[in-house]
Design a protein with these regions (language model features):
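N-terminal periplasmic/intermembrane-space "pro-region" immediately following the signal or transit peptide
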Residues: 2-150, 430
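Residues that define the transmembrane beta-barrel architecture of outer-membrane proteins
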Residues: 130, 161-170, 220-225, 274-278, ...
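Outer-membrane beta-barrel proteins
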Residues: 145-149, 199-205, 251-256, 303-306, ...
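Flexible, surface-exposed loop regions and adjacent strand-edge segments
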Residues: 151-155, 206-211, 258-265, 309-318, ...
Length: 538
């Protein structure tokens, strides 16, 4: 691991020397598509593998792809300025969810070596003509940790097993983007995005291949965190977009897809809140500065077919007093409301959300999320991202109550070990041991400070506080603080490395180096984790 990090660092220091001019592929005459876009196809070559290799070669050391001078404008001319660039950031617009970005999205706009390689084939031409793209990435990494128990890095995110190398995620998108720049016709889009790797642990929805996580605790698994269609109606104000299917929940700085994050690891703030939901999400651009959102879905990490589904209850109790009980009490109709404002300069953006709100009963991950995200750009080098929220669930079983714990162990809850032998939701450690259940709450605040020295590098400092008030989110009733620093270096728009080091401290009780699935208690208050990953886009 150490040798790998040294090698990556050395490679990053020398690679720019090869990017001054684009050299022609073997057997080709001089051609630089960055200066003469019309020669791009000639530069790439004829067969698939030659074109694929040459496209990676073309972009090496660059911070973007060649620009077609005949392409239509990539944004509405009166729209707020684009605050960032990719690379080195994981986004160009300040992130907001549940919709394709308004005013700045054109079809076929993703820079993809695979699509370039397919460009002169019958399949590639058909895909391009229908504005469909196929692309993705492979993300692998490893960590060095003071923890030693399998699963002992948790609740730190993404590095479940300490001192290991892993395939984090292999992802492929099948996608059509609606054209949100134009205002003269209704357009449509879709995305189907299967994922495979260790990170399936963080996207699993109960009822969709969840046996891998809940019944087998598989180290690697597959999921489909995004499968949706959408319609864009530009004639309504500045545009109305309706999305239907399964999609990532709308708030948060981060996302579970590797390419959407500054650092390799995600914050505890993100990893312990909502991930995905299924249903309908509407987003209305009222003006160029204001976006309103309203969604109707079926809970968080829940499937619609679990709504009203019942299972036998072998041990009726005060929480579930009948002979049957809900399979997932969180799989119920839910409402999401969001408001986003951005300044004309796009130096400031604030996003306030009530996410997937329902009765709030203890579910697989039925979090009632209330919070906001704020971004501020100081200049082209510096910006901050800030997020804070409060989440809660009601009627969470109290594991400090002996009668409640007996009901849990004897199959009297939907999340008893008879139904979920691994990774079921935690109960609460209520303030009063005499109550059978209580409301479990958690609060968080997250800060990223980012410095961009040049177009291929970004340095991120992360600081966060997480208060697991009843211990329902992490299994330990404690406050956490975490701070980490990471470097994102891009060799090209297609290849990125992200070394980092993070320090975690549990202030009130040991919270690391244990494994509830294996019956190993946590015995450390501190986790120090160094890690690095690589993302290769295709």
């Amino acid at each position: 691991m150490k040798k790998a990090l040294v090698s990556l660092a050395a490679l990053s220091m020398v690679h720019d020397a090869y990017a001054a001019d684009t050299l022609p592929p073997a057997g080709k005459t001089w051609c630089d598509p960055y200066k003469n876009y019309s020669c791009l196809d000639s530069y790439l070559g004829d067969d698939f593998f030659t074109r694929l290799v040459n496209y990676y070669r073309l972009e090496w050391g660059r911070d973007g792809s060649p620009v077609d001078p005949k392409a239509p404008p990539s944004r509405r001319d009166y729209w707020p300025a684009t605050p960032q660039t990719t690379p080195p950031m994981p986004f160009t617009e300040w992130p907001y969810g549940g919709t394709t970005s308004f005013g700045v999205t054109r079809p076929n706009s993703t820079d993809s070596p695979l699509m370039a390689a397919l460009g002169n084939t019958t399949l590639g031409q058909a895909l391009n003509e229908n504005h469909i793209q196929i692309y993705g990435w492979i993300n692998a990494g490893g960590n060095l940790s003071n923890n030693t128990v399998r699963g002992g890095n948790a609740p730190a995110a993404d590095l479940y097993n300490p001192n290991t190398v892993q395939l984090d995620q292999a992802v492929i998108y099948f996608e059509r983007l609606p054209d949100t720049v134009q205002k003269d016709h209704i357009d449509w889009g879709f995305r189907i995005a299967p994922i495979y790797g260790e990170n399936y642990r963080y996207t699993t929805a109960y009822g969709l291949w969840s046996y891998q996580f809940l019944n087998h605790n598989s180290n690697y698994g597959y999921d489909l965190p995004m499968a949706y269609g959408e319609v864009f109606i530009p004639q309504i104000m500045e545009g109305l977009l309706v999305r239907v299917g399964r999609f990532i929940t709308i708030p948060d700085i981060e996302a579970q897809l590797a390419v959407n994050n500054y650092m390799y690891t995600r914050s505890m703030t993100y990893s312990l809140d909502n991930y995905s939901t299924t249903g309908v999400q509407t987003s209305l651009a009222v003006t160029k500065n204001w976006i309103l959102q309203l969604g109707a879905t079926f809970g968080t990490e829940a499937m619609p077919w679990h709504w009203n589904a019942q299972i036998a209850n072998p041990f009726p109790n005060p929480l579930y007093p009948n002979n049957t009980m809900p399979k997932d009490p969180g799989a119920v109709p839910s409402v999401t409301v969001g408001v986003r404002w951005t300044s004309d300069s796009d130096n400031d953006s604030i996003y306030v959300v009530a996410d997937v709100i329902n009765q709030g009963n203890w579910g697989y991950n039925n979090l009632q999320w209330l919070g906001l995200v704020y971004y501020h750009k100081f200049n082209d080098q510096w910006h901050i991202s800030f997020e804070t929220y409060d989440v809660h669930q009601n009627n969470v079983l109290n594991i400090l109550n002996s009668a409640a714990l007996n009901a849990l162990n004897r199959g009297g809850t939907p999340f008893s070990p008879q139904y979920m032998p691994f990774n079921g939701p935690f109960g609460a450690q209520c303030a009063n041991a005499l109550v059978f259940s209580c409301t479990a709450e958690s609060r968080a605040a997250l800060w990223y400070l980012n410095y961009r020295p040049n177009p291929l590098n970004n340095i991120s400092w992360r600081f966060e506080w997480f208060d697991d008030v009843e211990g329902q989110r992490t299994g330990t009733k404690t406050n956490y603080i975490e701070t980490g620093i990471g470097w994102q270096h891009w060799f090209s728009p297609q290849i990125e490395i992200r070394p980092e080091v993070s320090f975690y401290r549990s202030l009130n009780a040991p919270a690391f180096n244990g494994n509830f699935n294996l019956g190993i208690p946590r015995d450390k208050n501190i986790a120090l984790i160094g890690s690095a990953d690589i993302i290769i886009h295709f």
